[in-house]
């Protein structure tokens, strides 16, 4: 059963991956599943900022 993600632009994933951040948009990642969690919706261009929010990569502080 999917958990509720409380922050905007997050989605629950049963097979956790490697999230992009403002510091590194694409994070090299193995194919093994990490623990299930809420992750930023990478397919829509969202990455995790320093405050833990999911924002568009182009909106990251320069």
Swiss-Prot record:
SUPFAM superfamilies: Serine protease inhibitors. GO terms for cellular component: extracellular region. It holds the Pfam family TIL. This is Trypsin inhibitor. Disulfide bonds join 5-38, 15-33, 18-29, 22-60, 40-54. Belongs to the serine protease inhibitor-like (TIL domain-containing) family. Gene3D superfamilies: Laminin. Keywords: Disulfide bond, Protease inhibitor, Secreted, Serine protease inhibitor. InterPro entries: Ser_inhib-like_sf, TIL_dom. It is found in: Secreted. One of its GO terms (molecular function) is serine-type endopeptidase inhibitor activity. Residues 5-60 form the TIL domain.
